[in-house]
Amino acid sequence: MMRLLYLGFRIYCFIFRPKTLGVRVMLIQNGRVLLVRQTYIPGWFMPGGGVKRGETLEEAVRREAREEIDAEMGELSLLGIYTHFGEHKSDHNALFLCTDFSLGEKQDSEIAEARFFPLDALPEEVPDGHRQRLDEYRDGVEIPQFGEW
């Protein structure tokens, strides 16, 4: 069902060329990052999703982390705002960093799996934009505040 909805969304994007605003969070603990594999698209991603009307970026990232992986997060740092112009849409994503978090037991039905990976051994299926930001963090490189995702 989720794959069918995703296909419908891609058709919608082709026709209407929407602008989207989303959030992602880099959850780091003991040199490892928590990534999720979704049920409707292949790959491993940092948790996140869309910002709802009337919601701040911080509220959105906290809600998405709770919904997807039952995470309660402490202090957040905004790393930057990144853009991606693919699949006939204009994506804008705010990326946060959190090293103070706890995970519960439940997992959203959209999430097939959540797993920690060492920052120096990420799976091949991590999209380029996610991998670039994770590599910058791992290497201690200053992460640009703006750029491509």
Where are these regions (language model features)?
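Acidic, metal-coordinating catalytic segment for phosphate/diphosphate chemistry
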Residues: 1-24
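A cytosolic small-molecule/anion-sensing beta-strand core signal
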Residues: 29
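Unchanged
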Residues: 51-74, 83-137, 145-149
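Short, surface-exposed beta-strand-loop junctions and turns on beta-sheet-rich folds
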Residues: 41-43
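A short gly/proline-enriched turn/hairpin at secondary-structure junctions
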Residues: 45-48
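Short loop/turn segments immediately following the C-termini of beta-strands
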Residues: 38
